[in-house]
Amino acid sequence: MATMEEIQREISAHEGQLVIARQKVKDAEKQYEKDPDDLNKRALHDRESVAASIQSKIDELKRQLADRLQQGRTSGQDRDPTGVEPGDHLKERSALSYGNTLDLNSLDIDEPTGQTADWLTIIVYLTSFVVPIILKALYMLTTRGRQTSKDNKGMRIRFKDDSSYEDVNGIRKPKHLYVSMPNAQSSMKAEEITPGRFRTAVCGLYPAQIKARNMVSPVMSVVGFLALAKDWTSRIEEWLGAPCKFMAESLIAGSLSGNPVNRDYIRQRQGALAGMEPKEFQALRQHSKDAGCTLVEHIESPSSIWVFAGAPDRCPPTCLFVGGMAELGAFFSILQDMRNTIMASKTVGTADEKLRKKSSFYQSYLRRTQSMGIQLDQRIIVMFMVAWGKEAVDNFHLGDDMDPELRSLAQILIDQKVKEISNQEPMKL
């Protein structure tokens, strides 16, 4: 349970937010008066709603503060001298102090957890839209993903585009694409589309469209993705024809040579996955094809690597049971961890990049993908790393340290200027 000081601090913080929110309302009102269209009207309404919600939160906190003051006056004689709260089953006070009361009313334990997204419902919803709005939303959630999430955290947002509309009784109305932007406390429904689920689904549905427009997430562009993707067809064919050290050297049915190659191992993996594919995933693949999507059927597809251009946080469900695809995504997630480790070891890494060393893209990808129903084959990831790991690392975007002579010249100028305007010691560049 929060103390009175904590409640007072929270009230002060919200009052500061309220001042900003009211100023934004005034700005929106001026904009609406200047140009009274639907967009400005909606912006004004949204900002008024934000200001009203902050005001209601302040009112609620003030009620809590008043209740706490009243309790303090009346409960002195009722308080147990041992310090144990009424209702606590302990006979003696715990060494721990009493903390917050967690409200569970908003939780629904019958709802599935985030690991069990209803991919069929999500894909049916997404394929009901035209491709332009889907790809523009993907751009907003990848290239501009951080800013979009920051601006809309804790809200359910709508994407609109002139290409997306529906006819209602002969009237053309905009058809909005809804995406939820959760915060840490949000509980998502199985069919609710989050940025992670959106990227995962769309990357699996439209890899050829993403390739044609060269839409690569910044997260992927810095780990050598384009270097591996530019000659993908010849690269994957060469890899499939390379000797496979994980299979015994014996004649393989269908192999061009007497010795096993990676193609034989992938074919064997495909056979194992085919027997594991549940009906739900078969249904969503069939629906996607019926909707006109060109899906990846095998890893040597020209656009197979582009499934991961948008940095999905797990293997897309439309290619989960295609041999080698889930492992290809895991390979890229390891590259992200490798780059973060390198950046954390350099002086030029930003504070955010140094912090990211503590996270693990690979472990997250592994957990999310396996929760969808398959175990990754680590040997395929090893094969990818042996074949392409060094080339990918050589193409990492790591930033550069400043040239020592340039740094020295800049520091001299800083020192001179600081001495002119201050008696403080100059800071180091």
UniProtKB/Swiss-Prot annotation:
Pfam families per UniProt: Hanta_nucleocap (PF00846)
Region of interest called Interaction with host RPS19, as start-end residue ranges on this chain: 150-175
Subcellular compartments: Virion; Host cytoplasm, Host perinuclear region; Host Golgi apparatus, Host cis-Golgi network
Region (Viral panhandle binding): 1-175
Region Interaction with glycoprotein N: start-end pairs: 80-248
EC top class, as a word: hydrolase
Biased composition (Basic and acidic residues): 76-91
Region annotated Homomultimerization, chain positions: 1-79, 100-125, 373-421
Domain of life: Viruses
Protein name (Swiss-Prot/TrEMBL): Nucleoprotein
